[in-house]
Amino acid sequence: MADFIRTQIFGTCFEITSRYVDLNPVGMGAFGLVCSAKDQLTDQNVAIKKIMKPFGTPVLSKRTYRELKLLKHLRHENLICLSDIFISPLEDIYFVTELLGTDLHRLLMTRPLEKQFIQYFLYQILRGLKYVHSAGVVHRDLKPSNILVNENCDLKICDFGLARIQDTQMTGYVSTRYYRAPEIMLTWQKYDVEVDIWSTGCIFAEMLEGKPLFPGKDHVHQFSIITELLGSPPEDVIHTICSENTLRFVRTLPRRERIPLASKFRNADPEAIDLMEKMLVFDPKKRITAAEALAHPYLAPYHDPSDEPVAEERFDWSFNDADLPVDTWKVMMYSEILDFHNVDIDVNGQPPQGQFEQVHAQAQAAVAQNEAARAREQEQQQQEQQ
């Protein structure tokens, strides 16, 4: 059994295995505190994220389970990679990933970026998104602080705590306001992978300008300043608004014409302007995809169709509609952690014994119960439609 060491970080107890030393706080991620550390096993620097109260409520448990499953499934050069995971004696969950030196937010705070760096960073973001979207996943919270960069300018997208299934029925208030797509504000219900493209367009503009493109003070101001630059949304987009209150608000705004982005970004390359215009489109159906953006002339110096992979299989979202108690989510997480560490058999080829065996069996039973409930629900819906 692993030895655990307790350390206080920002008044928070970090309880980690003795494998990791030299803890230093890095910052807060989505729903967790992040520290840098030294992995004595590999002699590499790593980031350790403590998930706050993973078993506090069913919602928090499900969110943690979702992030764990995503980190296990999504394996790509431009996505943060999970190297270890463990549950402490206090039942806190810790994700261990590679450590990158900084993030895009901090980089933009220090100095303007030169063209070749903007191109390379944008290329890597889109390369990662092409893979993520092909797996049937929407990140939902892309922003400069969720984009990590090392000294070689290698870039990795992190914080999949809010990521969701590609779906036409999603709940609304998720991404950081400055980078939030208009369809999230307009409909609060229906959106898909295109929200990540909008966020990327905002990040692209921020790399060019050195400051946020749409720094809204609140929800209303955010949408208003978007229309000041991009003009009023077209009628076919307005007709998709589900909320009566939102529809009334949009109708009260003065009619505005689109301002050419070239007049705002006077020093930008025309090809950069063209790509940004294809990203920052009100109608998500007309927004450029990640794969299409990679093939845009602006990214020609880096574009290589043979080295821009898609996911081998789509992510399994079968758990996503499950309404399960904390204890069930807990045993399912234990099972995922055992699977990550390949704790299926012992050194003699025998099934796991004791607690591991019990947890594994409980998790399998919980999953089977959930799948059976979903099957009954689908059967009932089919009968009602007949």
Curated annotation (Swiss-Prot):
Mention any one GO cellular component term assigned to this protein in its UniProt record: cytoplasm
Matching InterPro entries: Kinase-like_dom_sf, MAP_kinase, MAP_kinase_CS, MAPK_p38-like, MAPK_Sty1/Hog1, Prot_kinase_dom, Protein_kinase_ATP_BS, Ser/Thr_kinase_AS
Q: Name one GO molecular function term.
A: protein serine kinase activity
Cofactor(s) required for function per UniProt: Mg(2+)
Modifications the protein undergoes after translation, according to the UniProt entry: Dually phosphorylated on Thr-171 and Tyr-173, which activates the enzyme.
- Cite the active-site annotation: 141 (proton acceptor)
Q: How is its activity regulated?
A: Activated by tyrosine and threonine phosphorylation.
Coiled-coil portions: none
Location of the motif TXY: 171-173
Function noted in UniProt: Proline-directed serine/threonine-protein kinase involved in a signal transduction pathway that is activated by changes in the osmolarity of the extracellular environment. Controls osmotic regulation of transcription of target genes.
Q: What is this protein called?
A: Mitogen-activated protein kinase HOG1
Which species is listed as the source?
Yarrowia lipolytica (strain CLIB 122 / E 150)
